[in-house]
Amino acid sequence: MIREDVRNIAIIAHVDHGKTTLVDELLKQSGVFRENQEVAERVMDSNDIERERGITILSKNTAVTYKNTKINIIDTPGQADFGGEVERVLKMVNGVVLVVDAFEGAMPQTRFVLKKALELNLPVIVCINKIDRPEARPEEVIDEVLELFIELDANEEQLDCPFVFASAKQGFAKLNMDDESDSMQPLFETIIDYIPAPEGDENADTQVLISTIDYNEYVGRIGVGKIDNGKLKVNQDVVLVNHHEPDKQKRVKISKLYEFDGLNKVEVQEATVGAIVAISGITDIHIGDTICSPENPVAIPFQKISEPTISMNFMVNDSPLAGQEGKFVTSRHLRERLMRELNTDVSLRVEETENMDSFKVSGRGELHLSVLIENMRREGYEFAVSKAEVIYKEDERGKKLEPMEICYIDVPDEFSGAIIEKLSNRKGELQGMAPINGGFTRLEFSIPSRGLIGYRGQFMTDTKGNGIMNTVFDDYGPFKGEIQYRKQGSLIAFEAGEAITYGLFNAQERGTLFIGPGEKVYSGMIVGQTGRAEDIEVNVCKTKHLSNTRTSSSDEALRLVPKKVLSLEQALEFIDTDELLEITPENLRIRKKILDPTLRKRANIRKNNK
């Protein structure tokens, strides 16, 4: 059976090439919103962090109807760190729309997601977006995209893909640059003509592969997947087959069934082959599980998800200021929250450690883990994390292997020398260098993942904010040797109390301060950064001794340099292997793992003697 009235597509793109805006426009022009309805920009990015950072983290499901054909659209993340989302979502669709910026052209994450789509033999429609930009170069971008297809071993059918030119912001698409157009109709028509309709046997045994998990506090866990064969009905008895252990089968009942319409889930009594549905009523449903008929339960193979490459320890905050600002502070709270994240994030790994209060959390990159940390912080959690470390492997001969990444950098010509020097120091190897438009140079490096830990902030400083850096995981390669991360030491408070202007004034001569007057500090807390390689202990709580001629009012004459406020990413980049980042809903504090100065010195002596 072929469902000619349905098309299932994923929209894939490099970060910030406009795919979420494109989906917004398709929603508007298909009549999802009332004419007088106020519509937020990027309505598909519902998560606060997504809106703030302008990125998509979680894949979203929506549906529009065009000329009696229902088009299920899935907006996928463009970041390689959230590749786990992309890989499994592609199993639900019959084709993809690849969105490429008309100026920037084919970029690294484009390569990452496109490779996954081509491996699954999905047909591709290429949408050259932002053609209204004055510096747009659509003809050159077409050549770049076709070159990328060839590099990724696309077959002849995939190479013969249609190109659509669009401006999602202005709401039009066209098949040729010379055409006149004021709507997205050419893109709608191309989707219906080129993307195959879903196929399956309506009368066969039911098979639904669960590709994503949603959660609703009223109905609990909701599994989302495509019906490959058979039908689903409300109150139907089915069997849930676990993808880890196919022999582990459980009889369950479907309490509610939904299809997607616009941005909403609509309750239905029955759904058939090709439909993307949401199912509630199954408490322990997981990503990768298959819902089957009880008569013949056969699991659908699950797309292998790329392994994590970076890990950090999440632990209970044990600083002297612990428990004062957070709502959830115990190891039980921390454990429950991390385990809950595993329900919806297949790329994440959480392991217990020897220490009851510490958990090893592994992910696909610094961004992946920093988004989790930021979400937990906003929910009221208080905890501490260690420096990110890469996950090593060994080959058959026992040689150490480490994750390697391809790093693409676009910088103004005058900064390229400094970037090459910095990345060479971090074991990066220059693979390619070419001039691009507007006085920029494009650099391509092969570099260990650990060489990029803590580099992004340095990169923005070196390029005065004008550089663009993108990375994509390549493969595991031979260990490249030790890397020296931070050349500056820390300013460490050696007395607990409140920071005072006089103490800060004396301390600022030693380096850059991270705190201001009135802030609470404790012994072992890092209050700033020195200009030299070694750590320096300072007393920021020091007060001036008063005399008849010296009164405390003379403190007002002391001028403090404004403190340097670190964002979460900057703080994660800054910390060294012997330091922790204390995270609370109100503050980020950096501290030494060993707070006692005497014990810390002994530990350093032992480390240096090894």
What feature does the model see in each segment?
Residues 1-610:
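Structural and coupling elements of P-loop NTPases
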